[in-house]
Amino acid sequence: MSKLEPILEFVFTAHALKEMARRDITEQEVQEVLANPEQMEIVQDGRAVYQNKYVVSKTSKTYILRVFVDIDIKPPHVVTVYRTSKIEKYWR
């Protein structure tokens, strides 16, 4: 599998910032996913989800951080972000 194209310049929507605060997800975590994505999937015209797996050392539990991006806008807009433990459902 070839390396996915990173997104280095982007903006956060107000909704994304609100959800990140509510879900305790930092801008740095989002930047890491977009700079070095492990997976990317087009979910609808102009929108993609970038995601990475990571392990929380405190609990040893594996999660996916999913970042939804409107990619047809320049610069791309981060629309929403969440983490999930549903690896089987989302990891391709």
Q: Which ranges hold each PLM region?
A:
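Ribonuclease/tRNase effector modules and their secretory precursors
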Residues: 1-92
